[in-house]
Regions:
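Short amphipathic alpha-helix that is part of the acyltransferase structural core
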Residues: 21-65
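A short, internal acetyl-CoA/4′-phosphopantetheine-binding micro-motif in the GNAT/acyltransferase core
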Residues: 111-123
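C-terminal "cap" of GNAT-fold acetyltransferases
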Residues: 172-180
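Conserved acyl-donor/pantetheine-binding loop and adjacent beta-alpha core of acyl/acetyltransferases
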Residues: 85-112
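A short helix-loop-beta-strand connector motif used in the catalytic cores of GNAT acetyltransferases and
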Residues: 60-84, 89-92
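Conserved acetyl-CoA-binding loop-helix of GNAT-fold acetyltransferases
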Residues: 121-136
Length: 180
């Protein structure tokens, strides 16, 4: 069995309004960013250590999503106190490489977690499981939750420790699946 992260953190979607969960004493909210908030995506993705080469525009095009856990600035354009971020694409097949993923424009029922990073211990795990919960509720057509992870020992340990199963070892990537 896996430990379930604190369910008090909720994902907020929409225009990027900073809506804080009243139970969360840290004033940090997890939020979905849509295509109207390119400035926010640019602000977040400039720190992406996993896949910095993926353009910000692609990350929110064709149904792709960017989630973050942090606080937005007063003018709603910048993120402060960010503890985690995760980018998700929806595909019909599991990609074996970054190039394969970005060259496909088809949307599907497999959620591909292609980048996740955090600045606080445990925040990466929290954001993954919070996103899975969000997708189960808001995108019930999603049937699988799979990663496109760099082929590193750190990524391997992270996903295995969090209950994922290694389903493919590719030339430059791993695919892990979360059976939740």
């Amino acid at each position: 069995t896996r430990c379930v992260p604190d369910r008090r953190t909720r994902i907020r979607s929409g225009t990027g309004r900073n809506i804080v969960d009243k139970d969360d004493k840290s004033d940090i909210v997890m939020q979905l960013i849509d295509e109207k908030n390119l400035t926010t995506v640019e602000n977040i993705c400039q720190y992406d250590p996993v896949r910095p080469s993926i353009p910000c525009e692609w990350r929110i095009a064709n149904g792709n999503k960017v989630f973050f856990k942090g606080v937005k600035s007063f003018d709603m354009r910048y993120v402060t106190e960010m503890s985690a971020a995760c980018c998700v694409s929806f595909k019909n097949t599991v990609p074996k490489s970054e190039m394969e993923m970005v060259s496909s424009v088809h949307s599907g029922n497999i959620a591909i977690f292609y980048t996740v990073w955090s600045t606080r211990k445990g925040a990466g795990r929290e954001i993954i499981f919070n996103i899975v919960d969000y997708l189960k509720e808001h995108k019930p057509n999603v049937k699988r939750y799979v990663t496109l992870s760099p082929k590193t020992e750190m990524a391997k340990k992270f996903h295995l420790r969090n209950g994922a199963k290694l389903i493919a070892e590719n030339e430059t990537t791993y695919n892990f699946e979360y059976f939740v």
